[in-house]
Design a protein with these regions (language model features):
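Conserved GNAT-fold acetyl-CoA-binding loop/helix
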Residues: 3-25
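A conserved beta-turn-beta hairpin within the catalytic core of GNAT-like acetyltransferases
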Residues: 45, 55-65, 75, 121-123
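Conserved beta-strand-loop-alpha-helix junction that forms the acyl-donor binding cleft
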Residues: 75, 100-110, 128-132
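Conserved GNAT acetyl-CoA-binding A-motif
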Residues: 84, 91-104
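Conserved acetyl-CoA-binding loop-helix of GNAT-fold acetyltransferases
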Residues: 70, 76-89, 114-115
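Conserved acetyl-CoA-binding loop of GNAT-fold acetyltransferases
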Residues: 105, 114-123
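A short helix-loop-beta-strand connector motif used in the catalytic cores of GNAT acetyltransferases and
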Residues: 26-38
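Conserved beta-strand in the GNAT
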Residues: 36-38, 45-54, 64, 69
Length: 132
């Protein structure tokens, strides 16, 4: 499901290398601090995933979401909002104080997060540098 969502618009990620994909998913799920959630429909089909980890920070423990997606054919029908609410309940029960994530400001997911109560962290900026 991850590949089918993120290789389409608006992301168009190239996950054609299965070894790189396996390593990435292992990075996200194979650590002691990993925290993964799945959303299943009434037929027990996986329709959403959240891949992240627990981070201990001075202001409290957080859930950092690295990847969150809803199956493409289920987007726009409330599944994502339901999933976010369920994740909020679950991490609250764990005693976590915040959910943090990054997204591209030019994709529909950005507005989705705003509509679901996330606020932009304007005091931070992300940097990257290619070293090839």
């Amino acid at each position: 499901m991850f590949v089918s969502v993120f290789t389409k618009e608006p992301w168009c990620d190239d996950w054609s290398d299965p070894e790189q994909l396996d390593l990435y998913i292992q990075d996200l799920t194979g650590q002691g601090y990993s925290l993964t959630y799945g959303l299943f429909d009434d037929e027990d089909e996986l329709i959403g995933i959240s891949l992240g980890y627990i981070k201990h920070w001075y202001s409290g423990t957080e859930y950092i979401i690295n990847e969150l997606c809803i199956r493409t054919d289920r987007q726009g029908a409330g599944a994502g909002t339901f999933f976010i609410r369920e994740i909020e309940k679950a991490v609250r029960e764990l005693g976590l104080k915040q959910i943090f994530l990054l997204t591209d400001p030019n994709v529909p997911a950005c507005e989705f997060y705003r509509k679901n109560g996330f606020t932009e962290c304007t005091s931070n900026v992300a940097f990257a540098k290619s070293i090839e």
